[in-house]
């Protein structure tokens, strides 16, 4: 959003830079060629990478069937929105930045501001929609499977655009101050105090609060599940050390398949190990008592499960079996803790990037209209803040897609042109 225009917040005659206020009389001739070249290269690279990154995400979802699910539809819609920012908004913003003045006329300025606010607001609200979808998926996984439909995704996407439209249109209908159009060389968003509060809270502060709450609850739910798994693993290890093997869990088969199965149980004796018949336990060569049942699934496969013996305090499992279970329990505990660290890292990257890109911009956008006569915005700082917000459209596909292995595989296919051959 181009709330901070070249020249805003600075009425001095200091050397021109991207962010001096309206009323600034500097023209194209006052901007050095080196500034124009360097700025053009930097902003051109940012725009090119943003277009390429978001286009690849859209192409990956369109071409790879495994990526066509509700969660990725939201990511794809975010990529389309950021692609619109990159194609419709950033080129005009870059031209404005390089020339240090608006040269495209008032009508184009109004259209530019409306597109800017609409697309950037929709992009931010897409992040809320993704957070909401993830929150429902992790806190209500059973019921949400049936509710997580393309229709629901379409409703969330439509809502992001509706809110963006309601925030971007009012200035075109007159919710602005007369001073907003007083300088033909400047193109800024409405500085009306009421609209400033309405737009900044609707486009950023309320979505930010919502995302903090949602991701906070997602983290707590994920941590609860992970630590529950750790406790279960530790209990399993303790039971093994005290001579009790964990009973098979319902709805889980020996060979890892899920769902209900018909089982047939029979006792089998194995030479050199635990010798069992008709529920009686005999001592094996290693001195350990181990009852072994043979589990036959209706089909061809069979497995042998050690069960706790009822023949006194003799350990159920050989020492090697116990050590193996302890190693497995420790490995599972480490994996669970690693998942928790990964969850913290992922959520930190998502929220950290969003806040880093947009918070400085919206602080200035909220404060500046209320103290325009007394506030001074350094020109270079203003440019950095403005383009830091725009750069979120470049970083979104990296965070939400490129770290995903399924997307990585699809990108490799695109690069190798496998879809072309298909």
Curated annotation (Swiss-Prot):
Membrane topology per record:
Multi-pass membrane protein
**Entry's Pfam families?**
7tm_1
Q: Keywords assigned by UniProt?
A: Behavior, Cell membrane, Cell projection, Disulfide bond, G-protein coupled receptor, Glycoprotein, Membrane, Receptor, Transducer, Transmembrane, Transmembrane helix
Recorded hits in InterPro entries, A to Z, give: 5HT1A_rcpt (IPR000610), 5HT_rcpt (IPR002231), GPCR_Rhodpsn (IPR000276), GPCR_Rhodpsn_7TM (IPR017452)
Q: What is the effect of changing residue 345 to A?
A: Reduced activation of G proteins
Activity control summary: G-protein coupled receptor activity is regulated by lipids: phosphatidylinositol 4-phosphate increases HTR1A-mediated activity. Binding to aripiprazol drug is regulated by cholesterol, which shapes the ligand-binding pocket, determining the specificity for aripiprazol. Activated by IHCH-7179 small molecule: IHCH-7179 acts both as an agonist activator for HTR1A and as an antagonist inhibitor for HTR2A. Activated by SEP-363856 small molecule: IHCH-7179 acts both as an agonist activator for HTR1A and TAAR1.
* Record's subcellular location: Cell membrane; Cell projection, Dendrite
Q: What does the entry list as the binding residues for 1D-myo-inositol 4-phosphate?
A: 314, 345-346, 352, 403-405
Q: What is its main location?
A: membrane
Q: Where is this motif: DRY motif?
A: 133-135
Tell me which CDD domains the record gives.
7tmA_5-HT1A_vertebrates
Task: Glycosylated residues: list them.
Answer: 10-11, 24
**Quaternary state and partners of this protein?**
Heterodimer; heterodimerizes with GPER1. Interacts with YIF1B. Interacts with GPR39 and GALR1.
This chain's function reads: G-protein coupled receptor for 5-hydroxytryptamine (serotonin). Also functions as a receptor for various drugs and psychoactive substances. Ligand binding causes a conformation change that triggers signaling via guanine nucleotide-binding proteins (G proteins) and modulates the activity of downstream effectors, such as adenylate cyclase.
Q: What disease is linked with this protein in Swiss-Prot or TrEMBL?
A: Periodic fever, menstrual cycle-dependent: A condition characterized by recurrent fevers up to 40 degrees Celsius associated with the luteal phase of the menstrual cycle. Women show menstrual cycle-dependent physiologic changes in relation to sex hormone levels. Because ovulation triggers a significant change in the hormonal milieu that is similar to local inflammation, a 0.5 to 1.0 degree Celsius increase in basal body temperature after ovulation is commonly associated with progesterone secretion and is believed to be triggered by the induction of several inflammatory cytokines.
Name of protein: 5-hydroxytryptamine receptor 1A
Give the organism the record lists.
Answer: Homo sapiens (Human)
């Amino acid at each position: 959003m181009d709330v901070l225009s070249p020249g805003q917040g600075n009425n001095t005659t200091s050397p021109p830079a991207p962010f001096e206020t309206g009323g600034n009389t500097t023209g194209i001739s006052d901007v050095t060629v080196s500034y124009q070249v360097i700025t053009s290269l930097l902003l051109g690279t940012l725009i090119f990478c943003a277009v390429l990154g978001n286009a690849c995400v859209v192409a990956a979802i369109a071409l790879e069937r495994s990526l066509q699910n509700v969660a990725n539809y939201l990511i794809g819609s975010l990529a389309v929105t950021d692609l619109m920012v990159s194609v419709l908004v950033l080129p005009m913003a870059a031209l404005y930045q390089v020339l240090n003045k608006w040269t495209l006329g008032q009508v184009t300025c109004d259209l530019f501001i409306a597109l800017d606010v609409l697309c950037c607001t929709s992009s931010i609200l897409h992040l809320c929609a993704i957070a909401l979808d993830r929150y429902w998926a992790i806190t209500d996984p059973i019921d949400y499977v049936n509710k997580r439909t393309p229709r629901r995704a379409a409703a969330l996407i439509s809502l992001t655009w509706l809110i963006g439209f309601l925030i971007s249109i009012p200035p075109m209908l007159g919710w602005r101050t007369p001073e907003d159009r007083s300088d033909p060389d400047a193109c800024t968003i409405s500085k009306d105090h009421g609209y400033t509060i309405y737009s900044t809270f609707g486009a950023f502060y309320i979505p930010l609060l919502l995302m903090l709450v949602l991701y906070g609850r997602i983290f707590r739910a994920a941590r609860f599940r992970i630590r529950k798994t750790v406790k279960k693993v530790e209990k399993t290890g303790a039971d093994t050390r005290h001579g009790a093997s964990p009973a098979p869990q319902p709805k889980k088969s020996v060979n890892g398949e899920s769902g209900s199965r018909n089982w047939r149980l029979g006792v089998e004796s194995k030479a050199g190990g635990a010798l069992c018949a008709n529920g009686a336990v005999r001592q094996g060569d290693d001195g350990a008592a181990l009852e072994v049942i043979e589990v036959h699934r209706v089909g061809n496969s069979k497995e042998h499960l050690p069960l706790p013996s009822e023949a006194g305090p003799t350990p159920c499992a050989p020492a090697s079996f116990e050590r193996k279970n302890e190693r497995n329990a420790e490995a599972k505990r480490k994996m669970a803790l690693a998942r928790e660290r990964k969850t913290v890292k992922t959520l930190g990257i998502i929220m950290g990037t969003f806040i880093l890109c947009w918070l400085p911009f919206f602080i200035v956008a909220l404060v500046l209209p209320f103290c325009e006569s007394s506030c001074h915005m350094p020109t270079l700082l203003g440019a950095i803040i403005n383009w830091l917000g725009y750069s979120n459209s470049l970083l979104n596909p990296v965070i939400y897609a490129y770290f995903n292995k399924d997307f990585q595989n699809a990108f490799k296919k695109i690069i190798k042109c496998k879809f072309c051959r298909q």
